Amino acid sequence: MELSWGRAFWRNFLGQSPDWYKLALIAFLIANPLIFFINPFVAGWLLVAEFIFTLAMALKCYPLLPGGLLAIEAVIIGMTSAAHVREEVAANLEVLLLLMFMVAGIYFMKQLLLFIFTRLLLSIRSKMLLSLAFCMAAAFLSAFLDALTVVAVVISVAVGFYGIYHRVASARGEENDLQDDDHLDQNSKAVLEQFRGFLRSLMMHAGVGTALGGVMTMVGEPQNLIIAKAAGWHFGDFFLRMSPVTVPVLICGLFTCVLVEKLRWFGYGETLPEKVRHILQEFDDQSRQRRTRQDKLNLFVQAIIGVWLVTALALHLAEVGLIGLSVIILATSLTGVTDEHAIGKAFTESLPFTALLTVFFSIVAVIIDQHLFAPIIQFVLQASEHAQLTLFYLFNGLLSSISDNVFVGTIYINEAKAAMESGAISMKQYELLAVAINTGTNLPSVATPNGQAAFLFLLTSALAPLIRLSYGRMVWMALPYTLVLTLVGLLCVEFTLTPITEWMTQSGWLATFS
């Protein structure tokens, strides 16, 4: 029997999302205009809460859809204007270019990144050293590349290795279904469980590594670029200004990596089974024998492009997005990727998030027009200058752990800049607040997959169900890192940020505050 028109529409509306989620969104869309005409301030805060809800429920429905509907309605009923949204998008064009071109550019360097992580996995036998190597490699790469791409590469390595062992263990060849363990004997199942635990811990170490490295540079995370632009910092300035907080946090984060592996806490400590290592080593040996001169040349070319990328970013030779575009052009030209469809695949990872970021800017426009954060900012600015840094760090951290850190970082840096321009705070204090906002946005956000886009990407990937990585397990495994990164970051903002920044300024490392 064919569906009625009403039932067909209900099924189409937000697709596979649960009915309660659809009803909640409809309730939001009905309530917002009514409340707005009674009290615009309350309606504005309600919209922000609803938008954070859509981000927190990202596994139920990609936030672009419900968030986009809320943003469109906000413009229609007059919470903000289309012209203001355009201004916000124009002001953040560099971030959109970063997401469009840099992420796509790194896609064409995946072969090199896969090679690096494969060599790490098979050449280091100590699990503790391997975990440290994965965490450090992810941190270094994320300081220059997009964290999503780094995690995507590690996922590719893990899925590939999982598939190799699963195929051999099930003896089903190419017809093997990775989700089906029924064809494995008891011994193979036990080995597979250990292998899953091993991969889970490596993925979490790599994920946290992207946060440790990503906070240090202006290209590590999208919100970093927004904050750097608002403060007028280039690559070197940003790194030096963040270093009083980020360097101690990096050291303590790496120490935490070693500690949880050694003590086997929070689900860490599983080693690579020898049976699996033998199978993977055999496969890698065969792959190396099949590698042609063309393949080797591609790896060399990608390494040279990597050097260009780091140099161009460090010397600020062009806007970040344009450097990413140059990577696309060089990588495709020199490795023979000429088909339009092959090039188009590089953009599939970044464009949904780029569209979502544009919706973020619509909500930011509402926040500005309705003066939603004015009471919070006034409360913070009434505190002493020293206490302001701690409060900004904590407020950012709290919101970033449940919401997207790009959204949170954008809101707070805009408010801090407005306070500076109005004369409420000095330029010196504003630049210190920018550091507190950036570190507060990046570090505590490892608490949940909602805060870190790389974690959410891992949770929604094809790998997560294979290695039994659920939302709850991810939060539990991230807990030691959450505590260490948040507390060390807070202590550094409290005690080391101001004196070290002043020392670097007096030493001539930083430009004198204007």
From Swiss-Prot:
The keyword GTP-binding does not apply. InterPro entries: Na+/H+_antiporter_NhaB. It catalyses: 2 Na(+)(in) + 3 H(+)(out) = 2 Na(+)(out) + 3 H(+)(in). GO terms for cellular component: plasma membrane. The chain crosses the membrane at residues 23-43, 63-83, 97-117, 120-140, 144-164, 202-222, 238-258, 303-323, 357-377, 391-411, 447-467, 475-495. Its main location: membrane. It is a multi-pass membrane protein. Keywords: Antiport, Cell inner membrane, Cell membrane, Ion transport, Membrane, Sodium, Sodium transport, Transmembrane, Transmembrane helix, Transport. The keyword Oxidoreductase does not apply. It is found in: Cell inner membrane. Pfam families: NhaB (PF06450). It comes from the Bacteria. GO terms for molecular function: sodium:proton antiporter activity. Belongs to the NhaB Na(+)/H(+) (TC 2.A.34) antiporter family. PANTHER family: NA(+)_H(+) ANTIPORTER NHAB, TRANSPORTER ARSB-RELATED. Na(+)/H(+) antiporter that extrudes sodium in exchange for external protons. HAMAP family: NhaB. This is Na(+)/H(+) antiporter NhaB. It comes from Citrobacter koseri (strain ATCC BAA-895 / CDC 4225-83 / SGSC4696). The lineage of its organism: Bacteria, Pseudomonadati, Pseudomonadota, Gammaproteobacteria, Enterobacterales. The gene is nhaB.
